[in-house]
Amino acid sequence: MKYRDLRDFLAQLERQGELKRITAPVSTRLEMTEIADRVLRAGGPALLFENARHNDAPADMPVLANLFGTPRRVAWGMGADDVGALRETGELLASLREPEAPKGLRDALAKVSMLKAALWDMSPKTVRSAACQEIVWEGADVDLGRLPIQTCWPGDVAPLLAWGLVITRGPNARRQNLGIYRQQPLGPNKLIMRWLSHRGGALDFRDHAQAHPGKPFPIAVALGADPATILGAVTPVPDTLSEYQFAGLLRGSRTEVVKALGSDLSVPASAEIVLEGHLLPADDPRAVAAAVPEGANPPPATGYEMALEGPYGDHTGYYNEQDWFPVFTVDRITMRRNPIYHSTYTGKPPDEPAVLGVALNEVFVPLLRRQLPEIVDFYLPPEGCSYRLAVVSIRKQYAGHAKRVMFGLWSVLRQFMYTKFIVVVDEDIDPRDWTEVVWAMTTRMDPVRDTVLVENTPIDYLDFASPVSGLGGKMGLDATNKWPGETSREWGTPIHMDEAVKRRVDAMWDTLGL
């Protein structure tokens, strides 16, 4: 599916019967989450709440939810016709990350053409004026309370801005970083920026604080960017390629960007809403001193304004612990005329991140095969919170092979550094079929011999089951057939029906009355 921007994408979804306009009044507090959750679990359409109510009053704009509520809509957003076609996207990314040596002149020319398209033809196009800056709120007009930000769960500490595309640039970076990090409103012009320490935005901020201590760090947050740009921010794009370039490849046209009004950052020109501002040094007169609740640990000494974030209901199905993160002070809000507020919720799977994981699973397979060519298939079950459990099938070639694959998966892509459980099966097992996976585990595994336990590894900070926040264990399960050296016993012989008998039964089947 080809489209220009979010509005064009929504128009095409509506023609396909994949967008439902909700005209009844619906509150952004809890009601929207319950409706979206029921529709997502039923595999239903994207939802446009045209009569949203916010803070017991009509909202100034409609709210879009469940945009990526099915794998097919994720594929359409990435410019593919179906989920299976995302393997081609993965092949493209694999080639850009680690190009293989050409097999001949024709192959060499094809690779040059691909690199030219990625690195030059699809470089973002800067425009002088843009729809995202048709309306500007500055100074006292900045009021995040006017945006219909959802309160998703009863125990949430505040509303939650969940689909913000955060744009940063480190002092030594050649390109901008785009990432999606949740943000907690603190007041009319402040948000807590919850990014984990290894994410691109946090790394850019760390480098800035080291290179320019005591200087404000510019940030822009785009809401309602086109789907390719949003999805580019959650895809393992190689460091040589910007998310804007990757979005252009997906969309088939260069991403148009415009310079932010208050910084040198480039923002998506067609975004519905853009927040501009800075992370402020702690001694800036606009900064607010951190309030430390009784019994809580004080904030880390970053030299910048910090605040205690959470708790919020999260993709784990639980409320997360509170933690300290930097505060984003919003200097201005720009937007299109009649903007659409793009929102989502996270909760016990399936939710929108889980659906994204199912679709992006197809992108990961070629990337992993480039590093571990013995991989046949790879699956992240959505009920495993998108990334905490992986099942991989391999062409086993030697004793100990499964263990090599486990450690390879934990190391190849940053996306899998938090994967707690890896199950390795042979190529005759479909990793997407739990009946086959469980059969392999219960017949090909010895719990002591075939279980790998690793202590003190990086773990998602939202994982309260780990003994220490951010640090915990990993488990690998070798459910492959065992080779000499792995067992001294005679291995089981699998049962298979005689092929001649199967053909005879096929021939008589229609006469059996079954």
UniProtKB/Swiss-Prot annotation:
Pathway: Cofactor biosynthesis; ubiquinone biosynthesis. Transmembrane segments: none annotated. Catalyzes the decarboxylation of 3-octaprenyl-4-hydroxy benzoate to 2-octaprenylphenol, an intermediate step in ubiquinone biosynthesis. Its EC number is 4.1.1.98. Pfam families: UbiD, UbiD_C, UbiD_N. Its main location: membrane. Keywords: Cell membrane, Decarboxylase, Flavoprotein, FMN, Lyase, Manganese, Membrane, Metal-binding, Ubiquinone biosynthesis. Prenylated FMN binds at residues 180-182, 194-196, 199-200. Mn(2+) binds at residues 177, 243. The keyword DNA-binding does not apply. PANTHER family: 3-OCTAPRENYL-4-HYDROXYBENZOATE CARBOXY-LYASE-RELATED (PTHR30108), FERULIC ACID DECARBOXYLASE 1 (PTHR30108:SF17). Its cofactor is prenylated FMN; Mn(2+). The gene is ubiD. NCBIfam families: UbiD family decarboxylase (TIGR00148). It is found in: Cell membrane. One of its GO terms (cellular component) is cytosol. It is a peripheral membrane protein. It catalyses: a 4-hydroxy-3-(all-trans-polyprenyl)benzoate + H(+) = a 2-(all-trans-polyprenyl)phenol + CO2. This is 3-octaprenyl-4-hydroxybenzoate carboxy-lyase. It is an enzyme of class 4 (lyase). GO terms for biological process: ubiquinone biosynthetic process. It comes from Bordetella bronchiseptica (strain ATCC BAA-588 / NCTC 13252 / RB50). Binds 1 prenylated FMN per subunit.
